[in-house]
């Protein structure tokens, strides 16, 4: 199978490395210097240093060439750009008249200014296309690149898209599950990043494992309430892309969003944290959108409220936690 991966950050590189073991895989990056470096070193030192890339993986800086690689009906395109870049890539595919027959995205979050989920952006930019979906689940790029076991879910309304994605990814140490709840999968992937900031704050303040468990559990309830309000199915949020991804992101030391929370608890400013991070922390990007949508829909999300208060309103992390503890008692 021919596969094109668009985006050579840590996640795109890791997925391309996995795919190249079985398939004719091409990894596209906008930065020609990065492409040259990848080809010369067989390592993405910028985003995934120390991981040797498969000898069969090829690299490309020209988007039209990369898209042409994935045009056939038995091919697949994987969009590994962040949410902020998804709409532009869809427009580029449309303008180049090279929309792949089947494609999936792996970004998580809401578009900041429009509050759109990824599938809504795709539908707006490519209204005549139908075979697309989202690939998501509990996964750190470095572990995937190292060939460690992982389970992901592809959600799409298109059976053909689900089948192509399964055929491409389901091998080696990667297990793929299929479904059609695109909204539920996307909401889980977005909200868990915000909740991971909350657990990072709690852990950074030394509040203990009981507090962490409470935040994960009540955070899952918030995620599910919002997801159902937006059209997702409740059972999706107890699966890989809901509870599974939340557990990993909230507790794993490779989590950028958890790291943001830990550093906020230590007294660092958000600007300094993001400047030093060097990578996207989607929880920061989409927290306002999540809270805005929740308020609009009448969905109670107190943990998300507390995170936004710390991120954007100057509330001290310990004061935000105290506010949560002072909430009125209620039935679970």
UniProtKB/Swiss-Prot annotation:
Pathway: Membrane lipid metabolism; glycerophospholipid metabolism
Protein role: Catalyzes the reduction of the glycolytic intermediate dihydroxyacetone phosphate (DHAP) to sn-glycerol 3-phosphate (G3P), the key precursor for phospholipid synthesis.
Reaction catalyzed: sn-glycerol 3-phosphate + NAD(+) = dihydroxyacetone phosphate + NADH + H(+); sn-glycerol 3-phosphate + NADP(+) = dihydroxyacetone phosphate + NADPH + H(+)
Gene3D superfamilies in alphabetical order: N-(1-d-carboxylethyl)-l-norvaline Dehydrogenase, domain 2 (1.10.1040.10), NAD(P)-binding Rossmann-like Domain (3.40.50.720)
GO CC annotations on file: cytosol
Residues reported to bind sn-glycerol 3-phosphate: 108, 137, 139, 192, 245, 255-257
One annotated GO biological process: carbohydrate metabolic process
Annotated gene: gpsA
Active site residues per record: 192 (proton acceptor)
Family: Belongs to the NAD-dependent glycerol-3-phosphate dehydrogenase family.
Protein name: Glycerol-3-phosphate dehydrogenase [NAD(P)+]
């Amino acid at each position: 199978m021919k596969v094109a991966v668009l985006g050579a950050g840590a996640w795109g590189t890791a997925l391309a490395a996995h795919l190249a073991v079985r398939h004719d895989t091409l990894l596209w990056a906008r930065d020609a210097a990065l492409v040259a470096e990848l080809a010369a070193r067989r390592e993405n030192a910028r985003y995934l240093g120390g991981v040797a890339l498969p000898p069969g993986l090829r690299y490309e800086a020209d988007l039209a060439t990369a898209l042409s690689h994935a045009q056939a009906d038995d091919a697949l395109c994987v969009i590994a750009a962040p949410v902020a870049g998804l709409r532009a890539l869809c427009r580029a595919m449309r303008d180049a008249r090279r929309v792949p027959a089947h494609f999936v995205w792996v970004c998580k979050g809401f578009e900041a200014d429009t509050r759109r989920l990824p599938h809504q952006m795709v539908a707006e930019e490519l209204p005549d296309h139908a075979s697309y979906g989202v690939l998501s689940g509990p996964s750190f790029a470095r572990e995937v690149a190292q060939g460690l076991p992982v389970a992901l879910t592809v959600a799409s309304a298109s059976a053909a898209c689900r089948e192509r994605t399964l055929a491409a990814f389901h091998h080696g140490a990667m297990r793929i599950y299929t479904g059609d709840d695109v909204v539920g999968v996307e909401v889980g992937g977005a909200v868990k990043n915000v909740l991971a900031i909350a657990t990072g704050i709690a852990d950074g303040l030394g509040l203990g494992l009981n507090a962490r468990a409470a935040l994960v559990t009540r955070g899952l309830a918030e995620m599910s309430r919002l997801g159902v309000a937006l059209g997702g199915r409740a059972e999706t949020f107890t699966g890989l892309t809901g509870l599974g991804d939340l557990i990993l992101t909230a507790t794993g030391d490779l989590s950028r969003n958890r790291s943001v929370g830990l550093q906020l608890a230590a007294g660092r400013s958000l600007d300094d944290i993001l400047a030093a991070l060097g990578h996207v922390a989607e929880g920061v990007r989409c927290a306002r959108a999540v809270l805005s949508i929740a308020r609009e829909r009448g969905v109670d999300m107190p943990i998300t409220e507390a995170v936004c208060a710390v991120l954007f309103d100057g509330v001290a992390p310990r004061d935000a936690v105290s506010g949560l503890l002072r909430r009125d008692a209620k039935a679970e």
